Amino acid sequence: MKTQNSAKKPDTTEDDSVKSETKKPSRLKKWGKELVSMILIVGVASFAMDFYHSRSMPQGDAVPIVGQSIQGEDIDVIELSKNGKPVIVYFWATWCGACKFVSPTINSFNDSHQVVSVALSSGPNERVQRFMDAKEYDFPVINDLSGHISRDWGINVTPSIVIIKDGKISSIATGVTSPIGLWLRTYFA
C-alpha cells in the first residue's frame, strides 16, 4: 500500500513572495531601531547618573575658584566667565581611569574655549606638571592639594565638568563625556 503525502505545498506565486518580503522588516531597519533604542537608554541613564552625582554640587551661582595654576597663571573663574563666553571647569585626577578618556577632549577644547582644570589629590605641582608634559596636555591646572576646592564644590566623582557663564552654573556632567556632549553643553550655555 502506497502512502501519499496528503499535505501538498501550495503553489507560490510571485505576488505571495513579494508580500512576505514586505511584511518582514529589513535587517537594516531592525538594527536601526535597536540602535536608536540603545542610544535612548544610554542617554537616559547618563542623564540620571549626572543628576545623581551632581546633587551635592552647587546650583545657580558658581562657587568662586581663585588661585594660581601650576603654570604660574593667576586664575579667577567667575571673572573669566563674565566675558560672555562659557568657562569649562574640569575636575580631574592623575589617578582617575575615566579621566584618560575625557582629558584629551578637554585639551582639544582648550584651543577654542576657556578651560580651567582642578587636579584633585594628584600630588605636588611638579608631579602634576610631569603628568601634563607626558600626556602633552596644555590646559591650565589649579592643583587642589588641600582639597578645599573639591569640598567647596561637593565633588565626589572624577571627572566632573561644570560649565559656567556669567558667574552662573549652566551645566554639570560627571563621568565620561563625549566631545559632542561637551560641545553641546558649551553651545547652549
Where in this protein do the model-derived segments appear?
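Thiol/disulfide oxidoreductase modules built on the thioredoxin-like
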Residues: D133-Y137, L145-A189
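Short acidic-hydrophobic, aromatic-tinged amphipathic segments that line or gate anion-handling sites
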Residues: Q68, P140-D144
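Alpha-helix C-terminal capping segments
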Residues: L80-G84, S103-H113, A134-K135, G181-A189
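Hydrophobic beta-strand anchors of alpha/beta hydrolase catalytic cores
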Residues: I88-V89, V115, I161
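N-terminal targeting signals for export/organelle localization
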Residues: M1-Q68, A189
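Structural microenvironment flanking redox-active thiols in thiol-disulfide oxidoreductases
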Residues: K100-K135, L145-R151
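Short pre-active-site segment immediately N-terminal to redox-active cysteine/selenocysteine motifs
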Residues: G84-V87, F91-W95, V157
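A short beta-strand-turn-helix
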Residues: V66-V87
